[in-house]
Design a protein with these regions (language model features):
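Targeting-peptide/extracellular-domain and disordered-appendage signature
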Residues: 2-6, 14-373
Length: 373
């Protein structure tokens, strides 16, 4: 498997030489560290237990770690009550650890355009019969892409999350592409949810890989979404995940199935599983049931049952677009089905991502992400 460093070197070379030309298609596992040698991993800061997440400091980028993302999904209704989903994600990838701080004016000038950090932004709008997605790439440079602290801002060109304070909220989110765009207001007063063990989120049964991970699953969203030139007033609920690590996947893991579910009893459920590259079966799972007051229940892997019940073929590949999610000890028995089964992200890093409907012991809405298929 192509190693991350060489893969990102290729991406960075194309950016340096050809500006915003799109990189060649890669899979998510290549970018997130599977297949790397231990010596390569040791060049970056490891994820370790006991490091407390602090806010607003941890809203910022963590360049000593290899990968990171700011990941928003929203389930919305337009003025006629029609459901739709919006996704915005900004990824950060590092091809090498940051260089030492500049020692003088000449060093400052040299490092302004020399960076080991690359940003990739994805944006999408999904309805029952349409799915539009687009992406942008840029090196980390103040006039192009980055993360600001006061006020908080994550941006790549004119795709921007902009807060009025150093916290994530209140904020505006703007992205525009040829076939779609959105301008949204985001507010939340709920405490952040630290996933795993106080933000230390294990990604394998043996504990070899982990990330720092927190969420805000209780966001009020309003604004405008434009699709094929028609602008709609929308409102609904959103969810942001913040995650960073130096290796998300083992070489033996091929991808994941991830669900962000908003249930009818006013709780939110995050549940995900990682799959073995040889068998395609789940090798590790995790879940947390969350309340708006900041409390939550961590659910051990042995209590989580995920079963794909319907497949959708897209461009010769099958994607599981309907699932049974069962957590008997929490009286949760759900059928999770895609609002639009054809919501594959046809980008340089392809994956499936789209809004879902929930039926069963609870009703609700949410988002699903499928990688490695």
């Amino acid at each position: 498997m192509v190693r991350l460093a060489s893969t990102l070197t290729l991406f960075m070379s194309s950016l340096f030489l050809f500006g915003c030309e799109d990189p060649q298609q890669q899979n998510m596992g290549t970018l997130l560290g599977s297949g790397d040698t231990q010596s390569e991993s040791n060049l970056f800061t490891p994820v370790e237990k006991g490091n407390e997440l602090t806010f607003p400091a941890d809203h910022q980028a963590h360049p000593n770690f290899r990968h990171e993302w700011w990941y928003l999904t929203a389930n919305l209704l337009d003025e006629d009550g029609n459901p739709l989903g919006v996704q915005w994600t900004q990824f950060r990838f590092a091809a090498a650890p940051p260089p030492p701080p500049p020692r003088g004016e000449d060093d400052v000038k040299k490092t302004e355009w020399q960076t080991q950090q690359i940003y990739m932004a994805h944006s999408a709008v999904t309805t029952t019969d349409k799915h539009y997605a687009d992406e942008k790439w840029s090196r980390d440079q103040a006039s192009l892409a980055g993360v600001d602290s006061s006020p908080f801002r994550v941006y790549l060109d004119d795709w921007q999350w902009t807060s009025s304070t150093n916290d994530l909220f209140p904020a505006t989110l703007n992205a525009n592409s040829e076939q779609f765009g959105y301008s949204l207001k985001l507010t939340s007063s709920a405490p952040y949810q630290k996933q795993g063990e106080q933000g230390y989120s294990t990604k394998s049964a043996d504990g070899q890989v982990a990330s720092y991970y927190y969420s805000q699953p209780f966001i009020d969203v309003s604004g405008e979404v434009t699709i094929d030139g028609e602008t709609h007033q929308v409102s609904g609920e959103g969810w942001i995940d913040r995650e960073w690590s130096s290796q998300f996947l083992l070489d033996s893991q091929q991808g994941w199935d991830w669900f962000a579910l908003r249930l009818s009893d006013k709780t939110s459920l995050v549940v995900f599983q990682l799959r073995d590259s040889k068998t395609g079966q789940a090798s590790y799972a995790s879940a947390k049931l969350m309340q708006q007051d900041g409390s939550g229940i961590a659910i051990p892997p042995k209590d989580i049952q995920l079963e794909a019940t319907k497949q959708t073929e897209i461009q010769g590949r099958n994607y599981p677009t309907e699932w049974q999610v069962s957590i008997p000890k929490q009286q949760i028995e759900l059928t999770v089905s895609a609002l639009n089964p054809n919501a594959k992200m046809p980008l340089s890093v392809p994956y499936w991502e789209g809004p879902v409907r929930i039926d069963g012991s609870h009703s609700g809405t949410g988002y699903m992400e499928l990688t490695g298929y």
